[in-house]
Amino acid sequence: MSATEQPQQQQQKLRWGIAWIYSSSNNTIITITDLTGAETVARVSGGMVVRADKDKPSPWAAMQAAYKAAQLALARGINAVHIKVRGPGGYGMKVPGPGASAAIRALARSGLIIGRIEDVTPIPHDTIRPPSGRKGRRV
């Protein structure tokens, strides 16, 4: 091979999107948007892929939902995503639920190129009033 010959490289044009993963103790919701966040490409939840309500927060349901969302995104032309993971936050859990890591792995295995993974759980910088009010729940 001479210096003037270069191998033919297939340069795939990357079309980026954002995968928003909201994972609580009750469900996992995966939304894929364009980079601006204005146009929703795919929205799938754990409850859409399982029959029983008790299976909605499971990692298996999150994995199936992520596969389905990835197929919809690939069909619309998005082949690379940045991932933003969110837990309930506020007065609830500060960490994502059990389906978050399974959904990230499923997005990576489904053929999407993964860019950044970021945690965007809303965390209060002071305290917030609990749902039962100032003096607590009186039974």
Curated annotation (Swiss-Prot):
Cellular component aspect of the GO annotation: ribonucleoprotein complex; ribosome
Claim: rRNA-binding is one of the keywords in the record: yes
GO biological process, any: translation
Subunit-level organization: Part of the 30S ribosomal subunit.
Record function comment: Located on the platform of the 30S subunit.
Gene3D superfamilies, per the entry: Ribosomal protein S11 (3.30.420.80)
Name of the protein this chain belongs to: Small ribosomal subunit protein uS11
Organism name: Pyrobaculum islandicum (strain DSM 4184 / JCM 9189 / GEO3)
Keywords: Ribonucleoprotein, Ribosomal protein, RNA-binding, rRNA-binding
Family the UniProt entry places it in: Belongs to the universal ribosomal protein uS11 family.
GO molecular function ontology, one term from the record: structural constituent of ribosome
KW Ribonucleoprotein (keyword) present: yes
One Pfam match: Ribosomal_S11
SUPFAM superfamilies xrefs: Translational machinery components (SSF53137)
